[in-house]
């Protein structure tokens, strides 16, 4: 180990590198959180340009259209667990050990065994990608019954249901839903999420959000009388965006807060009038053993070889 990296050509990180630590004329790999034009990292991107830095963002490394390096599965695994944990803490119905206190993923799953899930724990999960797939693993481990979106309205008792884009978006003029059209240009679509809201209590947001797309639910929606959701685990964690209750990111040490819809402000997590919110933005860090092993394997399999074989698979 050495602190002086001036003789290195390529530097690997994970999260954003502090601007003051960027070394000019190097190649950096890290999650920059800039490619969606996130305003809070504009200075970081500008610094890379000014310092002649080649920035390679893990989010954009793909093979055959699929990302080769990602933590999404682990964000989903922990995010769904934290949602279940937060619900239990807010309503005092059961207690779960924090994920970061578990030895590994299996230990986390073991915490879910033997829980007597309350009948009013009715869960919606949005998304079908890596994040949502991780959340599904946790929900399956919980033993809570899964039902189809079509069964939600008439179902009694505890359940979870996974919604894909055709469930929570619809065209804004009544024309048939077109998945390819939605992904290419979502401007002709609007949220259809509210048709499920009266029948659910916990919402787990595991979708990918395009900034051009409609919000899933708005602050006005959250004020409606039939808005029955009382807890939101926002794994995607787009601040002040598609999930109206996410006012800020939370931390592993302090993962929960409350959102008072009537006043559109943050309040205590245990406020009886508040929607509970879990919005930790570095969820994979709660399972460092599993996440690090997976990340390292993906780097060694896909990225490191590309630096030496002329990038024959056009990953870089």
Where are these regions (language model features)?
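General beta-strand structural signal in soluble alpha/beta enzymes
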Residues: 3-6, 12-13, 55-58, 125, ...
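ADP-ribose/adenylate-binding Rossmann-like module
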Residues: 24-56, 202-262
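Adenosine-phosphate binding glycine-rich loop
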Residues: 54-111, 231, 236-316
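Solvent-exposed alpha-helices and their adjacent loops that cap or buttress functional pockets
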Residues: 3-5, 20-23, 47, 114-118, ...
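A structured beta-alpha segment of the ubiquitous adenosine-cofactor-binding alpha/beta core
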Residues: 1-8, 16-17, 163-227, 262, ...
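Phosphate/diphosphate ligand-binding glycine-rich loop within oxidoreductases
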Residues: 10-91
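Glycine-rich phosphate/diphosphate-binding loop of Rossmann-like nucleotide-binding domains
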Residues: 95-199
């Amino acid at each position: 180990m050495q602190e002086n990296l001036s003789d290195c050509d390529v530097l690997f990180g994970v999260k954003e590198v502090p601007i003051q630590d960027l070394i000019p004329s190097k190649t950096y790999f890290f999650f920059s959180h800039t490619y969606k034009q996130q305003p809070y990292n504009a200075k970081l991107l500008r610094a890379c340009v000014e310092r002649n830095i080649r920035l390679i963002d893990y989010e954009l490394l793909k093979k055959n259209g699929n990302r080769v390096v990602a933590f999404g599965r682990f964000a989903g695994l922990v995010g769904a667990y934290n949602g279940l944990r937060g619900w239990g803490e807010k309503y005092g119905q059961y207690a779960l050990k924090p994920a970061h206190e578990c030895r590994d993923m299996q230990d986390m799953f073991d915490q879910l065994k033997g829980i007597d899930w309350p009948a009013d724990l009715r869960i919606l999960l949005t998304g079908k990608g890596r994040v949502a797939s991780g959340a599904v693993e946790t929900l399956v481990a919980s033993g809570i019954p899964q039902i189809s979106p079509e069964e939600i309205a008439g179902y009694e008792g505890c359940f979870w249901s996974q919604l894909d884009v055709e469930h929570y978006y619809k065209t804004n003029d009544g024309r048939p839903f077109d998945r390819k059209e939605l992904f290419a240009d979502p401007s002709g679509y609007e949220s259809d999420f509210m048709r499920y809201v009266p029948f659910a209590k916990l919402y787990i947001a595991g979708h990918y959000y395009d900034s051009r797309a409609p919000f899933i639910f708005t602050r006005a929606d959250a004020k409606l009388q039939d808005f029955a959701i009382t807890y939101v685990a926002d794994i995607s964690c787009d601040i002040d965006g598609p999930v109206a209750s996410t006012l800020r990111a939370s931390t592993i040490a302090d993962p929960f807060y409350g959102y008072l819809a009537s006043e559109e402000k943050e309040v205590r997590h245990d406020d009886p009038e508040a929607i509970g919110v879990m919005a930790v933005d570095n969820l994979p860090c709660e399972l460092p053993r599993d996440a690090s092993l997976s990340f390292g394997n993906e780097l060694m399999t896909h990225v490191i070889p590309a630096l030496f074989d002329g990038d024959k698979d056009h990953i870089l």
